[in-house]
From Swiss-Prot:
Protein name: Biotin synthase
Species in which this protein is naturally found: Methylococcus capsulatus (strain ATCC 33009 / NCIMB 11132 / Bath)
GO molecular function: 2 iron, 2 sulfur cluster binding; 4 iron, 4 sulfur cluster binding; biotin synthase activity; iron ion binding
Cofactor: [4Fe-4S] cluster; [2Fe-2S] cluster
Superkingdom of the source species: Bacteria
Listed pathway(s): Cofactor biosynthesis; biotin biosynthesis; biotin from 7,8-diaminononanoate: step 2/2
Entry-linked SMART domains: BATS, Elp3
Positions contributing to [2Fe-2S] cluster binding: C106, C137, C197, R269
Organism lineage string: Bacteria, Pseudomonadati, Pseudomonadota, Gammaproteobacteria, Methylococcales
UniProt GO BP: biotin biosynthetic process
Amino-acid positions noted as binding [4Fe-4S] cluster in the UniProt annotation, renumbered to this chain: C62, C66, C69
Quaternary structure and partners: Homodimer.
Catalyzed reactions per annotation: (4R,5S)-dethiobiotin + (sulfur carrier)-SH + 2 reduced [2Fe-2S]-[ferredoxin] + 2 S-adenosyl-L-methionine = (sulfur carrier)-H + biotin + 2 5'-deoxyadenosine + 2 L-methionine + 2 oxidized [2Fe-2S]-[ferredoxin]
């Protein structure tokens, strides 16, 4: 490796303090975005955005009590329980996503943790989607060591398991799964040799200090997640957070920018809540270092901007869809 190559390698820190993160959030908005965009340009093409598609392969009746989630069996939200989709239907959806330009296909199942029989069905889905030439991601709750190894054997590229919020605010959002449970599953995914997709949700009534704490939890993992989805709360009638005050859009953009600074080599993804974002807000997020989106009409059980709207926005901003492997 040459000295120039060493100089261009990202400096990945895992020792961020609360004070440092809060100081970044407190920067003047223009200064924060300038720093984030400068770091972004060192490691990524600033006009390229990776596109993923997400399909709910098993919907509703989840035993967890996540306060934001319309799929929880604890709340009356109108989401109907649906069994695990067939392999044929999943592959048909993956093919459509591929034709629309998605390079990664993510499959979400509303479980606390998958049963072994269901895991075998998911493994077959992973193998089928891989055969289409797409990257694969699964989110299905907590995993055992053996389950993580089985998904790796099937060819799974990414496993999603979010921290959701800061460790200090976590108990306000969920009581049926501990913060440590989440860390344990992330370690099992790493030990099995898969990439990690891990982020959180903002706008759940947390403080700015909690948003800083969420990013510290992510950046101080033994390895930074390769993908960091930043979700804006989708307020769903029937959930405990349905009446939560809307987050200031600039606070969301700040969260994206600080995520970019603290995790310079990770893909920062705009995830749930984009249907509530203006084009101008999304443009600021891209300027702040977001370089991945979920693409398509729906995100699990919530609305997502239609593909045509995304194409128009990309054209207006001069953005390109990234190729496979980005």
């Amino acid at each position: 490796m040459t000295n120039q190559e060493r100089a261009e390698e990202p400096v990945l820190r895992h020792d961020w303090t609360q004070g440092e993160a809060e100081a970044l959030f407190a920067l003047p908005f223009n200064e924060l975005l300038f720093q984030a965009q400068t770091i972004h340009r060192r490691h990524f093409d600033p006009n390229e955005v990776q596109v993923s598609s997400l399909l709910s392969i098993k919907t509703g009746a989840c035993s967890e009590d996540c306060a934001y989630c319309p799929q929880s069996a604890h709340y009356e939200t109108g989401v109907k329980r649906e069994s695990l989709m067939s392999l044929e239907d999943v592959l048909e959806a993956a093919q459509r996503a591929r034709e629309e330009g998605a390079t990664r296909f993510c499959m979400g199942a509303a479980w606390r943790s998958p049963r072994d029989g269901d895991l075998e069905a998911i493994a077959a889905m992973v193998e089928g989607v891989k055969a289409l030439g797409m990257e694969t991601c699964v989110t299905a709750g907590m995993l055992s060591d053996e389950q993580a190894r089985r998904l790796k054997e099937a060819g799974l590229d990414y496993y999603n398991h979010n921290l959701d919020t800061s460790e200090s605010y976590y108990g306000e959002i969920i009581t049926t799964r501990t913060y440590q449970d989440r860390l344990d599953t992330l370690q099992r995914v790493r030990d099995a040799g898969m990439h990690v997709c891990c982020g959180g949700i903002v706008g759940m009534g947390e403080s700015a200090a909690d948003r800083a704490g969420l990013l510290i939890g992510l950046a101080n993992l033994p390895r930074h997640p390769e993908s960091v989805p930043i979700n804006l709360l989708v307020r769903v009638e029937g959930t405990p957070l349905a009446d939560t005050a809307a987050l200031d859009p600039f606070d969301f953009v700040r969260t994206v920018a600080v995520a970019r600074i603290m995790m310079p080599a990770s893909r920062v993804r705009l995830s749930a809540g984009r249907s509530d974002m203006s084009d101008e807000m999304q443009a600021l997020c891209f300027l702040a270092g977001a370089n991945s989106i979920f693409y398509g009409d729906r995100l699990l059980t919530t609305e997502n901007p239609q593909a045509q709207r995304d194409r128009r926005l990309f054209a207006r901003l001069g953005l390109r869809m990234a190729g496979l492997g980005c």
